[in-house]
């Protein structure tokens, strides 16, 4: 791309702001007319600056909202992980107790069986 094409492309992608300011002053005007044009130009510049500030504030608010949503989502996910881990622990502990009781019962049965055989 030529440098002109690059500049043309950048210009077409730039945000556009329209303000009604005459492109040239008319000769022989009074100072009040000049002041009026200058006031209009200043007013247009202030409007553009105000719009830019409003846009920046909107973007800042949106970023803050996204940050809060991400934080809440992470906290909810962490709470779910903790709950699931607790359920797994309770299940494993319960099964361990059942297995322990089953082993004790089997050991007593084997012991009785051995005692019965030894008596005969």
Swiss-Prot record:
One of its GO terms (cellular component) is cytosol. It comes from the Eukaryota. Residues 1-19 form the signal peptide. Residues 90-103 have a biased composition (Basic and acidic residues). Residues 48-71, 90-120 are annotated as: Disordered. Disulfide bonds: none annotated. Keywords: Signal. Gene3D superfamilies: Apolipoprotein. This is Uncharacterized protein At4g13230.
């Amino acid at each position: 791309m030529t440098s002109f094409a690059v500049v043309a492309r950048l210009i077409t992608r730039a945000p556009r702001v329209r303000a009604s300011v005459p492109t040239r002053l008319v000769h022989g005007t009074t100072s009040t007319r000049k002041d009026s044009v200058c006031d209009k130009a200043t007013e247009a510049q202030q409007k553009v600056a105000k719009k830019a500030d409003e846009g920046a504030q909107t973007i800042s608010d949106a970023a803050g909202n996204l940050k809060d949503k991400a934080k809440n989502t992470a906290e909810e996910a962490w709470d779910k992980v903790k709950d699931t881990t607790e359920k797994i622990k309770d299940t494993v502990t319960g099964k361990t107790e059942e297995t322990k009781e089953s082993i004790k019962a089997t050991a007593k049965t084997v012991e009785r069986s051995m005692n019965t055989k030894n008596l005969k």
